[in-house]
Amino acid sequence: MMEKIRKGDEIVVITGKDKGKRGTVLRRVDDEHVLVEGVNRAKKHVKPNPVKGVAGGIVDKDMPIHISNVALFNPATKKADRVGFKALDDGRKVRVFKSNGELVNA
């Protein structure tokens, strides 16, 4: 199945506490959530683990964000944009921006 938002895409948060922030998708957590670099950060308390060499303390961590709260960044318009799909003549299915019809770079 074709995904509208993939790993490596540059996105804009369109709603929530981080509205307007831009970041890169690190991975898809599941069908409905993505992990975005520098967005939706939370403080997590980590226990020290001398065996693994981990020092304890409070760590900032990226948390998953729902896919409905993000939109793909369109470099041509410099704004967040919706994504659609288009079948090419050679049979490939590609992602396109809804506003201007340009192909999304893979």
UniProtKB/Swiss-Prot annotation:
Keywords: Ribonucleoprotein, Ribosomal protein, RNA-binding, rRNA-binding. The keyword Cell membrane does not apply. It comes from the Bacteria. SUPFAM superfamilies: Translation proteins SH3-like domain (SSF50104). SMART domains: KOW. The keyword Ribonucleoprotein applies. One of its GO terms (cellular component) is ribonucleoprotein complex. GO terms for biological process: translation. Pfam families: KOW (PF00467), ribosomal_L24 (PF17136). GO terms for molecular function: rRNA binding; structural constituent of ribosome. NCBIfam families: rplX_bact (TIGR01079). Part of the 50S ribosomal subunit. Belongs to the universal ribosomal protein uL24 family. One of two assembly initiator proteins, it binds directly to the 5'-end of the 23S rRNA, where it nucleates assembly of the 50S subunit. One of the proteins that surrounds the polypeptide exit tunnel on the outside of the subunit. This is Large ribosomal subunit protein uL24. The lineage of its organism: Bacteria, Pseudomonadati, Pseudomonadota, Betaproteobacteria, Rhodocyclales.
